[in-house]
Amino acid sequence: MGVFVEAADVSRDAIFLDARYNLQNKQWGKEQYDAAHIHGARYVDLEQDVSDMTSNRGRHPMPSHEQLQQLFQRLGLQLDDHIVIYDQGGAPFASRVYYMLAYVGFTNIVIVNGGFSALVAAGLPVNAEAVNVTPTTITPNWQAQLYASREDVKAIVDGNVQAVLLDAREEARYRGEVEPLDKVAGHIPTARNYFWEQAKKDGKLVVTDALTQTVSKDEPVVVYCGSGVTASPVFTLLKEAGYEDVKVYVGSFSDWIEAYDAAKK
């Protein structure tokens, strides 16, 4: 099963998760959800739900096992549920939720390419009704092979582990020419660069030649960005393209620079 699905092909019997968000206006996504969402959809907030904002391991740190288990139980999910995730389209937030679900062990999950507006155009029912969810109990099947820690990345930089570090930020940030968010400019040493927005096309995310030419399928890949958010769509696109050994360094550059130097070029 692929990662991305067209809105016209979505099963209406699926469980929908609404991941709309705006990094510049953090209330926007929930406000949009409250105004109108796919019937029965449950809202997942980037910072309140799929980041541990109390941690110091980056700007959008990885939640703990306990936090993720409690989140998906509160959302009323089971590991074998068919789950459809959407955001506003051409955004990284549905991919972030996809990654967390995959990490916990959910196996039947897809992202709507084109997001909420595509689902509306496809005729799925929309309303503003509150959704009553019965909490579940799940036993996670942790997929540790999807996660890279700072120590894992250091082993790659030092040449002790063979893998490609892939920086999903724009080229100017990768090269260290500008840095609007973090206290140090540059990139993790040895990293290659593929700006995630190259994959945006007409409100969708697509696998591009630039991506598949930057890293080959026989290379293990660890994707990172500034805080682990925009690395997520590169992860999902690589999985869509059939890459098997792909991890996300969720702490990303904002975590790396707390301990190690950055490279510039």
Question: What would you call each of these model-derived segments?
Answer:
Residues 1-265:
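Cytosolic catalytic domains that perform sulfur/thiol-centered chemistry
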